[in-house]
Amino acid sequence: MTVGTRITRSIALSGLLFGVLLAFGWQRHPPTRAIAWALIGALIWGILQAAVILVGFGRSSGKRLHRVWRWGMVLTISTAFLLYLTLTSDSILPLRHFLSDSKAIRHTLSCGIHALLFGAMAIALLFVVWRKSDPFSPRLSGAVSGLAGGLVGSVALEMVCPHLEAWHLWIGHGLTLVMLVAFGWYAGRRWLAP
């Protein structure tokens, strides 16, 4: 399979999962804020997700400069997502108040589990498409897969989640992205090395 075919399949599969999660979420929780802004946000994060796949997998991964560029992309986009969550939150409860609210904890765990499930499905699909394709830096390719999968799960879920408290967003959405990047890095050696 050529690199172009793999990139096309990766973007199509990730985009499909992203769209499915948005559709299910908006069906259950129709956005009360301006729907145009939500759609613009979804489009921007979708384009960013496609760029992650294109930049992360589109060139030879054996060159040192390319590895530095890819790690920079993983860290920059993860940080940008956490900043985005901070900016979109409408309140920050003291941590002890957040932890004592059982409804908030249940909702945070529910969002985190859904983000992990959809993100893990995206990573699994990317691992199948890119299986045994990176002899030089399979862990880095795994981290890129984790970032792309995390964008599917965490970003799409964040756009349909009605809960905008900062701790909820950081734990239920941001931490799941970080966990999926770490999982991709760990599993990349087994799945992506020839």
Predicted regions and their residues:
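Selected alpha-helical membrane-embedding segments in polytopic membrane proteins
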Residues: 4-106
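Alpha-helical transmembrane segments of polytopic membrane proteins
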Residues: 36-48, 106-118, 169-178
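Hydrophobic alpha-helical membrane segments
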Residues: 140-157
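Extracellular/periplasmic helix-loop-helix junctions in multi-pass membrane proteins
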Residues: 158-173
